[in-house]
From Swiss-Prot:
It comes from Polaromonas sp. (strain JS666 / ATCC BAA-500). Residues 9-19, 49-60 have a biased composition (Basic residues). Residues 1-60 are annotated as: Disordered. GO terms for biological process: translation. The keyword Ribosomal protein applies. The keyword Ribonucleoprotein applies. Keywords: Ribonucleoprotein, Ribosomal protein. Belongs to the bacterial ribosomal protein bL32 family. This is Large ribosomal subunit protein bL32. GO terms for molecular function: structural constituent of ribosome.
Length: 60
């Protein structure tokens, strides 16, 4: 098992953790329906960037 040779200082520990921050997922608002959805994903009603791209079960 690996064992550290020297104690990591609080400064180095903080630098090591600098990339561990959580990010907020990008939320977009559909222009035609006003619904929110994840960026680069279609909305629950089947719209993407103002166009109908998928038929929903209620329409089929």
């Amino acid at each position: 098992m690996a064992v550290q040779q020297n104690k990591k200082s609080p400064s180095k520990r903080g630098m090591h953790r600098s990339h561990n921050a959580l990010t907020v997922p990008g939320i977009a608002v559909e222009s035609t329906t006003g619904e929110t959805h994840l960026r680069h994903h279609i909305s629950p009603t089947g719209f993407y960037r103002g166009r109908k791209v998928l038929k929903t079960k209620s329409e089929a």
